[in-house]
Every structure is written in structure tokens, then in C-alpha cells.
Curated annotation (Swiss-Prot):
Reactions that this protein is recorded to catalyse: a quinone + NADH + 5 H(+)(in) = a quinol + NAD(+) + 4 H(+)(out)
PANTHER family in UniProt: NADH DEHYDROGENASE, NADH DEHYDROGENASE [UBIQUINONE] IRON-SULFUR PROTEIN 7, MITOCHONDRIAL
Pfam families assigned: Oxidored_q6 (PF01058)
Cofactor note as given: Binds 1 [4Fe-4S] cluster.
Subunit structure: NDH-1 is composed of 14 different subunits. Subunits NuoB, C, D, E, F, and G constitute the peripheral sector of the complex.
Lineage: Bacteria, Bacillati, Bacillota, Bacilli, Bacillales
Organism: Geobacillus thermodenitrificans (strain NG80-2)
HAMAP family with a match to the protein in the record: NDH1_NuoB
Name this polypeptide is given: NADH-quinone oxidoreductase subunit B
Name of the gene: nuoB
Matching InterPro entries: NADH_UbQ_OxRdtase-like_20kDa, NADH_UQ_OxRdtase_20Kd_su
Subcellular localization, as worded in the UniProt entry: Cell membrane
Cofactors, names only: [4Fe-4S] cluster
Length: 170
């Protein structure tokens, strides 16, 4: 059906603006991806307890479209929470490599972001970003569940912005 835009009244134009969405396929895919994140949990220390609380009834991450997955092949977000040791680093990288594209990483807590209180230990990695690229950092020792939900929302915003601009957002 062809629409003659010049013959429409102002009220009809306003009705079209309210009810018709104009977008690109990339933006639509970005919206769908951002609203159906499936995180792979990688809990290594006390931050993992806070991450488990997000999946509980009080916070209920499922209502945001995120479902925790146990397999990296079914996940598109890796949430690293806790102290990453040099012995654990190759396993973390292998799990990241097994995730399908597009994939994102959230570093949760002081240990995952910068080594935490164990930063001077010989066996601790000084931030998970030395192993895998990190998209969102969540500070705290441990961060509360609301901070993790906020970090997931920031990741959703980043995914939508990347889909809209077509460029990688730092």
C-alpha cells in the first residue's frame, strides 16, 4: 500500500509517529540481543554468592530476559566474579572462546576488575581484562545484587548503542 505523505493531515502524521516504528535490521537485532542476554556464570569467590542472589526470587533476573546458563555454547555474556588465579586463566579463556559471537564479558567485584585484596599475590591475575576483553566493570567487594543488575542494564545500553551506530563502544 502506498501512502501519500503530502496528503496526510497533521493529526494523521502524529498518529503514524505514535504507531509506526522505523528502524534498521541491525537495530532490531541489537534490541533483541539486549533483551535476551544469557549469562554464563563464572563464580570464583564471595561475589558469586551475590550473583546467585540475583537469580533468586527477590531480584529475579529472569524478568529482565536473562537466564543463567551452565554451558558456554548457550551463553552470550560471561560474568566473572571473584579472584582469577594464573592457573584458572587458561580455563577462563577457553570458556570465552567456546561462546558464540556476539559475546560480552562483565567483571564483577574488585577481584575480577583489578585483583582485589589479593593483588600482591604471585598467583593472582591483576584483572580479568588481561585474559578476555571486558565490556562492563562492576566495582565493590562484593558488589550487591542491585549493582549487578545495574551493570547488566549498562551492557544492554551498550549493545543497543553499538547496533545503532555500527561502531564498537568502549
Amino acid at each position: 500500500m502506498d501512502v501519500k505523505w503530502d496528503s496526510m493531515t497533521f493529526d494523521e502524521m502524529e498518529e503514524v509517529k505514535r504507531n509506526v516504528f522505523f528502524t534498521t535490521l541491525e537495530q532490531l537485532k541489537g534490541w533483541a540481543r539486549s533483551n535476551s542476554l544469557w549469562p554464563l556464570t563464572f563464580g570464583l569467590a564471595c561475589c558469586a554468592i551475590e550473583m546467585m542472589a540475583v537469580g533468586g526470587a527477590h531480584y529475579d533476573l529472569d524478568r529482565f530476559g536473562s537466564f543463567f546458563r551452565a554451558s558456554p555454547r548457550q551463553s552470550d555474556v560471561m560474568i566473572v566474579s571473584g579472584t582469577v588465579t594464573k592457573k584458572m586463566a587458561p580455563l577462563l579463556r577457553r570458556l570465552y572462546d567456546q561462546m558464540p559471537e556476539p559475546k560480552w564479558v562483565i567483571a564483577m567485584g574488585s577481584c575480577a576488575t583489578a585483583g582485589g585484596p589479593y593483588v600482591k599475590s604471585y598467583s593472582v591475575v591483576k584483572g580479568v581484562d588481561q585474559i578476555v576483553p571486558v565490556d562492563v566493570y562492576i566495582p565493590g567487594c562484593p558488589p550487591n545484587p542491585a549493582a549487578l543488575i545495574y551493570g547488566i542494564h549498562k551492557l544492554k545500553e551498550k549493545i543497543r548503542l553499538e547496533a545503532k551506530t555500527g561502531k564498537k563502544v568502549l
